[in-house]
Amino acid sequence: MQRITVLGATGTIGVNTLDVIARHPERFSVFALTGHRQVDRLAGQCRQFRPQVAVVADAAAAGELARQLSGMNVEILHGEAALVAVAASGSVDAVMSAIVGAAGLAPTMAAVRAGKQVYLANKESLVVAGRLMMEAVAASGSRLLPIDSEHNAIFQSLPADFSGDLDASGVERIVLTASGGPFRGWSAQQLAHVTPEQAVAHPNWVMGRKISVDSASLMNKGLEVIEARWLFNAPPGRIEVIVHPQSVIHSMVRYRDGSVVAQLGVPDMRTPIAHALAWPERMDAGVPALDFSLLGGLTFEKPDQEHFPCLGLAFDALREGGDQPAVLNAANEVAVAAFLEKRLAFMDIPRLVQKAMHQFAGRVSNSIEELLELDAEVRRHLLCSLAN
């Protein structure tokens, strides 16, 4: 039986993870659940899964959770140190890293350094600290299994014995598919008037607000390009993005002999979650079978980088190296939050990100602490700029 900590249990990935775990009580035992400030949802999850530990953001949330779980034998902790503790605990075999944003970086690194099997849904761990994260994986013997549908699809489409050498495996290119988001085909005039309500309405996937905006701007795909570089040791010139509006093909691998291997499925995050949790086996995810007779057609087109420049900015950050991906990520988080609060126009998101990349060019951090300091510095600078 696998003992697991779920970081970010109350978010979309966390909820889907627990849905899969609930289908296989004989395989999994939940050691810890974390839920930031969604106390009501976390309390319900604690009643169902009976973890030994629950972690929230602060003392106020911890007090409310304790009140709701009165009489239950669960240790309630709060703060980043508690997240790190449950991620690295000797009582767990594996960690689902599903906290959104840079807040997930420290506990994910702690899990890796402790040699855990890490189910990686937190993009920022590789976007912000890819080099450091992969060095830690190599040093500790940890294993990263990707949860993003695209990276999980690539993982499934590569040879089972893939060891990080594309040439040795006969791989030409990795192809990430993108839905194109809700604004695919829109004009510049239309994009100038996009509202947060429109941006969070993804055509194919059920996701959180931040990642929905990233999908709409194609920044999500840009972050995935950076992740793919580290997960599969793929230079930017061997990563390709294609728009596939139906979201049935989740990603592909082009091989030297002309073959293309793809992973298909109904757009449901429980599939990649179940694949990772059961790897190298397979188990039921509760997902309906893909009915080819109902598909109609599968279409593809090049991404529109003129109207959606965030994808190009991510490639730029990857090529420039150093801390540019971390700067891009921090700036994007600030910009998206401002957009959701209706303080920034949708098309100003890439402008703000590009401005930050110019202002913080040339930085190179050599520790998680330095990266987090840079992250905070970028955020402070941009928040001050927005306030003025």
Curated annotation (Swiss-Prot):
Its cofactor is Mg(2+); Mn(2+). It comes from the Bacteria. Its EC number is 1.1.1.267. 1-deoxy-D-xylulose 5-phosphate binds at K123, S149, E150, S179, H202, S215, N220, K221, E224. Pfam families: DXP_redisom_C, DXP_reductoisom, DXPR_C. InterPro entries: DXP_reductoisomerase, DXP_reductoisomerase_C, DXP_reductoisomerase_N, DXPR_C, DXPR_C_sf, NAD(P)-bd_dom_sf. NADPH binds at T10, G11, T12, I13, R37, Q38, N122, E124, G208. This is 1-deoxy-D-xylulose 5-phosphate reductoisomerase. Belongs to the DXR family. Keywords: Isoprene biosynthesis, Manganese, Metal-binding, NADP, Oxidoreductase. One of its GO terms (biological process) is isopentenyl diphosphate biosynthetic process, methylerythritol 4-phosphate pathway involved in terpenoid biosynthetic process. Gene3D superfamilies: 1.10.1740.10, NAD(P)-binding Rossmann-like Domain. NCBIfam families: Dxr (TIGR00243), PRK05447.1-1 (NF003938), PRK12464.1 (NF009114). Pathway: Isoprenoid biosynthesis; isopentenyl diphosphate biosynthesis via DXP pathway; isopentenyl diphosphate from 1-deoxy-D-xylulose 5-phosphate: step 1/6. Coiled coil: none annotated. GO terms for molecular function: 1-deoxy-D-xylulose-5-phosphate reductoisomerase activity; manganese ion binding; NADPH binding. Catalyzes the NADPH-dependent rearrangement and reduction of 1-deoxy-D-xylulose-5-phosphate (DXP) to 2-C-methyl-D-erythritol 4-phosphate (MEP). It catalyses: 2-C-methyl-D-erythritol 4-phosphate + NADP(+) = 1-deoxy-D-xylulose 5-phosphate + NADPH + H(+). Mn(2+) binds at D148, E150, E224.
